[in-house]
């Protein structure tokens, strides 16, 4: 779930703010030394559409999927519970869908995985009652993909990762 941030504090957030036509460099592939390292020990929030795609991909009922792969956390200040992907019970706390060759649910991976290394939020102007999406380029320090030469804009990255449908299903 998103944390409220005051508009004057937006520049204090970690990462580089990326606007619609700004470019960033990123490419992840098995030859980067850190391949799959980001798929560990995550607080990975699942949206209803993520759950739907994953359970169908795995051939599970909703109940079976939630029981096997999800932690539901009710935080005191929140009206709705947080739905988190449960990490594997191994020393690295890997994503349960991580296999040697990468992600075993890649075509149906969650929205958060699709948009990585971009993090998104909403800028809410209480006076105008408007919401504006904001994006930050935030790869972890160990990420070598950020030093690759492949250049992207936000719309090109969303298209490449087939993230537009996920955005439509999760932003509302």
Please identify what each model-predicted range represents.
Residues 1-172:
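Short loop/turn segments that flank or connect secondary-structure elements
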């Amino acid at each position: 779930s998103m944390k409220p941030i005051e508009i004057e504090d937006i520049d204090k957030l970690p990462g580089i703010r990326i606007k619609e036509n700004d470019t960033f460099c990123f490419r992840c592939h098995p030859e980067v030394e850190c391949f799959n390292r980001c798929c560990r020990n995550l607080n990975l929030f699942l949206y209803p559409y993520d759950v739907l795609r994953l359970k169908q991909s795995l051939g599970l009922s909703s109940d079976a999927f939630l029981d096997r792969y999800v932690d539901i956390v009710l935080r005191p200040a929140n009206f709705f519970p947080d739905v988190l992907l449960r990490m594997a019970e191994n020393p690295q706390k890997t994503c349960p869908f991580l296999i040697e060759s990468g992600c075993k649910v890649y075509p149906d991976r969650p929205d958060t995985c699709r948009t990585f290394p971009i993090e998104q939020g909403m800028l809410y102007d209480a006076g105008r009652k408007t919401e504006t999406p904001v994006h930050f380029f935030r790869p972890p320090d160990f990420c070598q993909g950020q030093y690759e030469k492949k250049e992207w804009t936000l719309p090109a990255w969303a298209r490449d990762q087939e993230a537009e449908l996920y955005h439509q299903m999760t932003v509302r």
